[in-house]
Amino acid sequence: MSFIDEVKIHVKSGDGGPGCVSFRHEKFIEFGGPDGGDGGKGGNVIVEASRNLSTLLDLRQHPHQKAGSGKNGMGKDRHGAYGKDLRLLLPVGTVIKDAETDEVLADLTEPGQPLVLLKGGRGGQGNARFATATHKAPRFAQPGEPGEERWLRLELKLMADVGLLGMPSVGKSSLITKVSAARPKIAEYHFTTLKPNLGVVAYKNYKSFVMADIPGLIEGAHEGAGLGHRFLKHLERTGHLLHILDISWMPDRDPIREYEAINKELSLFNPELAEKKQTIVINKMDLPVVKENLAKVLPYFQERGLKVFPISAATGEGIPALLDEIARQLWGAAEEEW
C-alpha cells in the first residue's frame, strides 16, 4: 500500500480557435468586404493551493488534464469565445516540477495566489484583418496557435507544525489519536502507519496546531529502506519534532541506540533535518516496566540538554505538560504564561 504524496500528470492549455473567412452578404451590397472574425484564445492552465485538500488522489485517478480550446471566429466580425481555463486546486505544500528536467516550476506554500502555469494558444486572425488597398478580398485566415503541454510531477510535503518521529510501533499513532481528531489505523505490528496522518490539536484559548504522524523509520531509511525516502521527505517542513521512544523492551531493544540510529538517518538524508529542535517523549508510562526503566535512560538526554516528557498515550498521563511544551516551542510561551 502506498500513500499519495507524488503523482505524474499531463497538462495542456487550450488551442487557439481559427480565424474565419467570411464576406459581407447584405441586400443591395453585391461585393461586400471581408468580415471574418478572430478565433478565441485557448484557456490557460492555472494552479492554486487550497487548505481544503490534503492529498493528490484525485489527480492520480485523472492524470490527463486539458483546458478548453478557443472557439472559431465567425462572420460579421464576430470573435470566437475564449476557451475555459483549467484551474487545478492542489493541497498547500505541493511542489510542482517539470517531469523531464526536474525543474521546480512552483512551490505552493500559501493558500490562494493563483499561478498561470501554461498559457493558452492565441486565436487566429480572421480575413478581415488582412484586407489592404491592393488586396481587398483576402480568402484566407490564420489558424489558431496550439496550446502548451507538459508532463508535471507533483510532490506533496506535509505542512505540519509538529512531526512525530520514532521507530515503528513506539506509539506515534496512539498519541496523535489521543490529542487530535485524526484516527489512524493502529495495531501492534510494524509499519501500521503506511501514509502520513495529519491531526489538528486544539490547544487552550482556541489555539491549535497541526501534528503529523510520520510512519515509523528504520535504519537505512535515507537509502529508501521501509519507504524511508518518502517518509523522510515529509519531515522537511515540519517545524518541531517529537521523538517518541518505547523503553518497555529493554534490554532486548536499546532505545538509546534506536534514538541515535534515527538521528543518523535524518543527517544522512538532509543535514538540516538533524538540526531541527527535538523534544524527547517516553511513551507507555502506564506499564510498570517503563517506570522502572525510565531512570536508566534519563541521564543520557539530560547530559545533552534535551527535555524529556514521560507520557501514556493510552491513559493521557503527562500529555497536558507535553502540549504546554509544544506551545512554548511554537509560540514562545504556554497559555498560562501569557
UniProtKB/Swiss-Prot annotation:
Q: Does the keyword Metal-binding apply?
A: yes
Q: Which residues form a coiled coil?
A: none
Q: Which GO terms describe its biological process?
A: ribosome biogenesis
Q: List the EC numbers from the record.
A: 3.6.5.-
User: MF terms per GO, please?
Assistant: GTP binding; GTPase activity; magnesium ion binding
Q: Which residues form the Obg domain?
A: 1-159
Q: Where does Mg(2+) bind?
A: 173, 193
User: What is any Pfam family matched here?
Assistant: MMR_HSR1
Per UniProt, subcellular location reads as: Cytoplasm
- Cofactor(s) this protein cannot do without: Mg(2+)
InterPro entries (UniProt xref): G_OBG (IPR031167), GTP-bd (IPR006073), GTP-bd_Obg/CgtA (IPR014100), GTP1-OBG_CS (IPR006074), GTP1_OBG_dom (IPR006169), GTP1_OBG_dom_sf (IPR036726), OBG_GTPase (IPR045086), P-loop_NTPase (IPR027417)
Q: Which residues form the OBG-type G domain?
A: 160-331
Which terms are listed as keywords in the entry? Cytoplasm, GTP-binding, Hydrolase, Magnesium, Metal-binding, Nucleotide-binding
| Primary location group | cytoplasm
Q: What class of enzyme is it?
A: hydrolase
Q: Which CDD domains match?
A: Obg
Annotated residues that bind GTP are located at 166-173, 191-195, 213-216, 283-286, 312-314
User: Which superkingdom does the taxonomy of this entry point to?
Assistant: Bacteria
Q: Name one GO cellular component term.
A: cytoplasm
PANTHER family linked to this entry: DEVELOPMENTALLY REGULATED GTP-BINDING PROTEIN-RELATED, MITOCHONDRIAL RIBOSOME-ASSOCIATED GTPASE 2
Q: Self-association or partners: how does it assemble?
A: Monomer.
Q: Which family does the similarity line name?
A: Belongs to the TRAFAC class OBG-HflX-like GTPase superfamily. OBG GTPase family.
Q: What does this protein do?
A: An essential GTPase which binds GTP, GDP and possibly (p)ppGpp with moderate affinity, with high nucleotide exchange rates and a fairly low GTP hydrolysis rate. Plays a role in control of the cell cycle, stress response, ribosome biogenesis and in those bacteria that undergo differentiation, in morphogenesis control.
Q: What is this protein called?
A: GTPase Obg
Native organism: Geotalea daltonii (strain DSM 22248 / JCM 15807 / FRC-32)
- Show the taxonomic lineage: Bacteria, Pseudomonadati, Thermodesulfobacteriota, Desulfuromonadia, Geobacterales
